[in-house]
Amino acid sequence: MKLKTIFRQAYRPAILAFAVFVVQPPALARAADAPAAAGQRIVLPAAVTPDHYRIDLTPDAKALTYKATVQIDVSVHQPTDRIVLNAADIVIDKAALSGEAAAPTVSYDAKVQTATFAFARALKPGPYTLSLAYRGKIYQQASGLFALDYDGAGGKKRTLFTQFENSDARRFTPSWDEPGRKATFQLTATVPADEMALSNMPIASTDALPGGLKRVHFKETPKMSSYLLFFGLGDFERVHRDVDGVDVGVVVKRGDTASAGFALDAAAHILPYYNDYFGTPFPLPKLDLIAGPGSSQFFGAMENWGAIFYFERDLLIDPRVSTQGDKQGVYIVVAHEMAHQWFGDLVTMAWWDDLWLNEGFASWMETKVTDHFHPEWKVWLQDLQAKQFAMETDARDGTHPIVTPIYDVLQAAGAFDAITYLKGAAVIRTLESYLGEDAFRAGVRRYMHDHAYGNTVTDDLWSEMDRGSARPITQIAHDFTLQAGVPMITQASAKCEGGVTSLAVTQGHYAIDPGSTTARVWRVPVIAATLGAAPAKAVVSGERPTPIALAGCGPVVLNAGQTAYFRSRYSTDGLAAIAAHYGALSPDDQLGVFNDTASLAYVGQAPMADFLDLTATFKTLAADPVVVQAVGDRLDDLDTLYEGLPSQAAFRAWARGVLGPVFARVGWDKAPGESDNTALLRARLIGALGDFDDPAVL
């Protein structure tokens, strides 16, 4: 699922598509769950589990209500006199259980959103079918079954969609609405004959009905979690093509097919790549990318299996007005949601503790596949700003481990955050770089093969990685996923003799808040290199210096390629050597060294003079626009700190001296073939220099 893109402008101007629940929709605030006992999850009883749902839906879009029936094939595992499942804002009018003559008594618990069916006698273990007739509401915000209105050619029109993650399938049908309670689903819908109905699977058959209606029967889904079920209805058109034997389509409101081509092309690129990378072909016969009218609410897209929902701004590209940045944004959101078709849909976390298995992997994979097909977009460079945001969040007192205990669904809704998405992605990249791309991919393939259609915990993934490696992957992964915070690697010494640099480093803790300074120990995979030489790998842990032998005698980069999740603290001499050769570093290393030096200086863990000296090199350095934008952001931050002080004028003069020459090189006018990042940089420089009272832009 993609969160509302609240970090796009600040950290990845063109393409960051970070989006999931930030807040619950206010009009749909859930009833508070009952307080969980310490360390105890609020979950449904294990005595009865679902196997298959047959749902028959009749929505009334105008009245914003629906009625439905569901037959749930269940397995009773131990004697019990009740069946408990999830239901919210649903009225159950009739209930019956196969083999039981008397109807059960139905009671509701609004706090924990359950319905309980009590029977006169205990049910024996075995298979049963629970049949229910019920009715519910169609919401006007994205929760459960909801409506989106728009102005069409013939006036106001209404579309219907579903949004169930993390726990709103219970608003659509009584169900075992937990990720670990997988089952198969078969949906039938009675809808207007002139509208298109959509679900996870293709249509099996359609029956014409009186009164301008039709009855649409969808094929049965594979075994999946309830939050992935989808239904859509509206005046749609669909463009599609065959990709690796899968019918891939983009669904838009009527008249918008000209804007669907870019997303369809993107999906056609990405699907074969994922089929190969995961080693398990996409298992459904069709994959739809569905554009909902309007802009995002509290999320941008949702990975319903075979029926991915997007708001239009995250999927459609108007060839007449869309920018290259718009295309990058759409491409990466498409990549994110398609990655979920494996990480999240085919293999699903057993409970919300391990949500990062869905979101961290999709966030990492979106960048990996985008860079594969569009290296010219430099998305890994832009991704460093996402990692920067994650580190600044993770260095605060209020952070939490990637794998964190979740006791109820309300708490689960709060887990869709920067730690789950951005730190999760950064840690995956750390481990892939340390283990190697081929070995890491082999572990992912084993994981997909062994756990297809099932549920997992994080250690299931690490065990697959350990099977193919002599390196301590599980131990390292535990340090980064089970404890919060940001490790720091400090350059203790570096001496070159005979063409080999003897480097010594220590491991510490980068923290912003005073309460975050408790000593923590990580096993940190470090990939260090001297400028222009091959890197060396080592695992660094604790304050005792760890020696690393590096080829060459140039400046040392502690996080060569910036693929690992840690802060690098250089000695003053080490940073001066880097600054003297700054232009020879890759843009990734330029940005990583700059971010680390600035962040450490801000919290007093490195001299501010070192940061200012490094910043001054940008007067003459022809750096990548993404790097220079980061410099401008940092200078803006410093200017805020000087607000109202006599020294602010002197600082602004110094800042003008750094950014003014950069703006002179960029100029006022767009150059032929100029990148979007350069255009964004121009606007950023004009704004910053204006703040710094530069007459050249005033």
Which residues make up each language-model segment?
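N-terminal, polar/Ser/Thr-rich
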Residues: L3, V22, A29-K67, A153-T159, ...
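Glycine/proline-rich low-complexity spacer/linker segments in large multi-domain proteins
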Residues: I42-P45, K124, A133-Q186, G234-D242, ...
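Ligand-binding face of N-terminal immunoglobulin V-set domains in extracellular IgSF glycoproteins
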Residues: K67-A87
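Hydrophobic helix-coil surface modules that form long, contiguous segments used
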Residues: A68, Q163-S167, P174-A335, W364-T367, ...
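A surface-exposed beta-strand-loop module
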Residues: D89-D151, P174, P210-G212, R544-A551
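Non-catalytic accessory/interaction domains
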Residues: T188-V191, K214, R254, A339, ...
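Catalytic Zn2+-binding segment of zinc metalloproteases
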Residues: M338-D353
